[in-house]
């Protein structure tokens, strides 16, 4: 027998590894609406299977917990059982030797804290209501509730105009979202059970590119009611689009010269060309929406007072977005050469881009705005562009695709560095950034916090500092008019109404803080429905499109179609769109990858889909 042997995985271990891969795909695709008690019991069994059997809390205790959770699921448990589960889980958490045991105990305790009422429902009524309400994942995870399986099936049938009509029922920004949406609909796609999520955003782009001119739906008879909408961003425009269809005359008051909000002034042309955004806006305005551009609402000279709007319109919707920048709060931040990312992107949108030719640029921040500023600075001729972020690259809130694209175009990511001070010359211009090296520390609020590393600060020479650490809302004029706010955000209720302010509604970034485009659109949709009710009506929005029935097909594993991009060396020299659309063959293949969850595997869709709201 050999003294030592090269270790190889056994056949059994190879099978187990494959099972782990299958399990990972299942976890990724776990849709909203699953029974949380069932999920807790299933994960507990996995933890128990991983135990080494050395310590009693893990070897015996997890088995006892399993049995008690099975009693809950089988309707055999009592409320005393629930108390015993809690005590047992705490004992395991406090006494297990390693993370296999104590993390299992923590998971059960966290479950009891987060969904105790579901445990009680099983105990008292013998069942959980979640399975009866389980939604189609892509539809449920789209903030606007777009009928994703429906429009994918229409694309598969090459009915592109109908696909656009169906999307517009819930989201009027078809083209814009096809290019820049963060596609939360894809995160829990059941196609992950087989191979990989359907490229939903890419299919939407194909429909938008090939639908031709799709006119807006006809509006209802005029109601005689008027609605003032403050802010012409995605939320305000969406609300106007639906309210106008309901027969209410809408007027948008926009302080800038162009509509679109951050879609126009915050997203560079290489991601969302202005002419493509104009397609969506023109469709909205074609319903009869009126606009008053270069008009500010406030209490200053030349501004229209909020009181006047309230007196002259039947309802008011505030959707002013979040268009001001946050400060670093460090010495030197007011120096020449320090600019906000929001202002920089706004200047680009207005056709007045800064000249960074030959400059060394540092961008502070880790979100999508920081990436937009970074990639724009490269296109504006910067010699070097570095992104400074106090956490790790993995902790950045920007889309990973955007981060990788910035790196591919030449940007450097300075992770775990926090800005400490900005150095200037005698003329008050930036010369260097002083950065404090960090290490990753304790997890608070779901993300690890940076901590002092003990290393000396470093000096990074630079000519320009772009600050992209967040956005604020200009709420003061509205607060003076009596609109309640907390930390600069308006306090709106779930239906978008403002408490004790009859006929006043608010939504979008000015309520939630800076969020995604699709969330702003969803807020406008919610506001439109509830403003319609407030005005004394109950109009319905529908598409009139019939979704084709699914065909019985053998859904064999098939790779996801990825969106191709222009060559890096070429695209970083201009602001032309980076991403290429799908070909006809790619779109057809991708559309047929959809598993049609609207018909298979989800009882909530039995008998029909949501055709109106």
What do these predicted ranges mean?
Residues 206-220, 282-294, 325-380, 485-500:
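Glycine-rich dinucleotide-binding loop and its adjacent helix/turn
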Residues 45-67, 90-107, 130-150, 172-193, ...:
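Local cysteine-cluster metal-coordination motifs and their immediate loop/turn environment
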Residues 252-287, 291, 348, 374-421, ...:
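Rossmann-like dinucleotide-binding cores of NAD(P)H-dependent redox enzymes
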Residues 226-250, 370-378:
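N-terminal Rossmann-like FAD-binding beta1-loop-alpha1 element of flavoenzymes
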Residues 1-130:
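Redox cofactor-anchoring modules in respiratory/redox and cofactor-processing assemblies
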Residues 334-358, 443-514, 547, 553-556:
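FAD-site-proximal beta/loop scaffold in flavoenzymes
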Residues 510-541:
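A conserved FAD-binding loop/helix module that cradles the flavin
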Residues 221, 226-228, 278-330, 421-434, ...:
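Feature captures the FAD/FMN-dependent oxidoreductase FAD-binding
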């Amino acid at each position: 027998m050999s003294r030592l042997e090269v270790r190889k995985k056994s056949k059994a271990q190879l099978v187990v590894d494959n099972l782990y891969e299958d399990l990972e795909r299942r976890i990724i695709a776990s849709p909203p609406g699953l029974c949380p008690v069932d999920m807790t019991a299933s994960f507990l069994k996995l933890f128990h299977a991983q135990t080494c059997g050395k310590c009693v809390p893990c070897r015996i205790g997890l088995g006892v917990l399993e049995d008690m959770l099975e009693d809950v699921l089988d309707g055999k448990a009592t409320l005393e059982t629930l108390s015993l589960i809690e005590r047992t889980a705490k004992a395991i958490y406090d006494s297990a030797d390693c993370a296999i045991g104590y993390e299992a105990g923590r998971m059960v305790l966290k479950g009891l804290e987060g969904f105790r009422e579901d445990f009680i429902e099983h105990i008292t009524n013998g069942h959980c209501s979640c399975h009866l309400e389980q939604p189609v994942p892509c539809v449920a995870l789209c903030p606007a509730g777009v009928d994703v399986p429906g429009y994918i099936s229409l694309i598969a049938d090459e009915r592109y105009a109908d696909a656009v009509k169906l999307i517009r029922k819930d989201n009027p920004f078809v083209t814009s979202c096809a290019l820049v949406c963060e596609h939360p609909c894809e995160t829990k796609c059941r196609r992950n059970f087989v191979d990989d999520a359907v490229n939903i955003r890419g299919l939407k782009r194909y429909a938008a590119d090939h639908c031709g001119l799709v006119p807006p739906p006809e509006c209802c008879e005029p109601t005689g009611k008027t609605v003032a909408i403050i802010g012409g961003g995605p939320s305000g425009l969406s609300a106007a689009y639906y309210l106008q269809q309901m027969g209410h005359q809408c007027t948008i008051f926009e302080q800038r010269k162009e509509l679109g909000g951050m879609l126009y002034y915050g997203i560079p042309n290489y991601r969302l060309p202005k002419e493509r955004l104009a397609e969506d806006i023109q469709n909205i305005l074609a319903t009869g929406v009126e606009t008053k551009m270069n008009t500010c609402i406030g209490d200053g000279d030349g501004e229209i007072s909020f009181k006047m709007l309230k007196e002259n319109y039947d309802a008011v919707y505030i959707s002013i977005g979040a268009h001001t920048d946050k400060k670093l709060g460090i010495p030197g931040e007011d120096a020449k050469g320090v600019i906000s990312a929001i202002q920089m992107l706004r200047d680009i949108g207005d056709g007045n881009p800064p000249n960074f030719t030959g400059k060394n640029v540092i961008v502070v921040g880790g979100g999508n705005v920081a990436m937009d500023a970074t990639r724009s600075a490269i296109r504006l001729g910067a010699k070097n562009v570095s992104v400074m972020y106090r956490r790790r690259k993995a902790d950045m809130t920007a889309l990973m695709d955007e981060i990788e694209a910035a790196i591919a175009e030449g940007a450097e990511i300075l992770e775990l560095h926090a800005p400490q001070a900005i150095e200037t010359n005698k003329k008050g211009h930036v010369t260097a950034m002083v950065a404090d090296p960090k290490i990753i520390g304790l997890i608070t609020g779901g993300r690890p916090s940076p901590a002092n590393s003990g290393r000396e600060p470093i000096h990074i020479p630079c000519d320009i500092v772009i600050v992209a650490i967040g956005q604020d809302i200009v709420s003061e004029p509205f607060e003076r008019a009596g609109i309640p706010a907390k930390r600069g955000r308006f306090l709106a209720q779930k239906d978008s109404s403002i408490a004790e302010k009859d006929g006043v509604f608010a939504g979008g970034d000015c309520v939630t803080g800076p969020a995604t485009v699709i969330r702003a659109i969803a807020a406008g949709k919610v506001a439109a429905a509830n403003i319609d009710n407030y005005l004394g009506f109950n109009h319905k929005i529908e598409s009139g499109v019939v979704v084709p029935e699914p065909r019985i097909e053998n859904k064999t594993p098939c790779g996801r179609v990825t969106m191709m991009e222009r060559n890096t060396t070429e695209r970083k020299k201009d602001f032309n769109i980076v991403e290429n659309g799908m070909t006809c063959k790619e779109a057809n293949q991708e559309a047929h990858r959809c598993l049609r969850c609207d018909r298979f595997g989800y009882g909530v869709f039995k008998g029909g889909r949501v055709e109106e709201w």
